[in-house]
Amino acid sequence: MKDKNFTGMPKELQPWEGFGREAQAVKIVVDKRRYGKFVTIIEGIDPKIEDIEKIAKELKKKVASGGTVKEGRIIELQGDHRQEVKKFLEDMGFKVSVEQ
């Protein structure tokens, strides 16, 4: 069964899907954790507007890495994937900044 909202339209046909993505300032940071392991942290995606779990799942597939959603608003991916994540999110319509 397809997801529907109050209009009864399937989610894929909703003209406002992705509305406001360019207004969200998404920040990508890489942090060094225990044993020298890197973690890519993505924050700034509004969970009220976007399905953050779905985005995290797609990102994990794209970069072939494990990851999680913290506090319902921060995506953490295992490894340094700054450039791949930046391109993926920009293709989705987000405004992305990468911190070195």
Swiss-Prot record:
A Pfam family annotated for this UniProt entry: SUI1
UniProt KW keywords: Protein biosynthesis, Translation regulation
GO biological process: formation of translation preinitiation complex; regulation of translation; translation reinitiation
Signal peptide start-end: none
GO MF, any single term: mRNA binding
SUPFAM superfamilies (UniProt xref): eIF1-like
HAMAP family according to UniProt: SUI1
Family as reported in the entry's similarity comment: Belongs to the SUI1 family.
The protein's name: Protein translation factor SUI1 homolog
Source species of the chain: Thermoplasma volcanium (strain ATCC 51530 / DSM 4299 / JCM 9571 / NBRC 15438 / GSS1)
Native organism taxonomy: Archaea, Methanobacteriati, Thermoplasmatota, Thermoplasmata, Thermoplasmatales
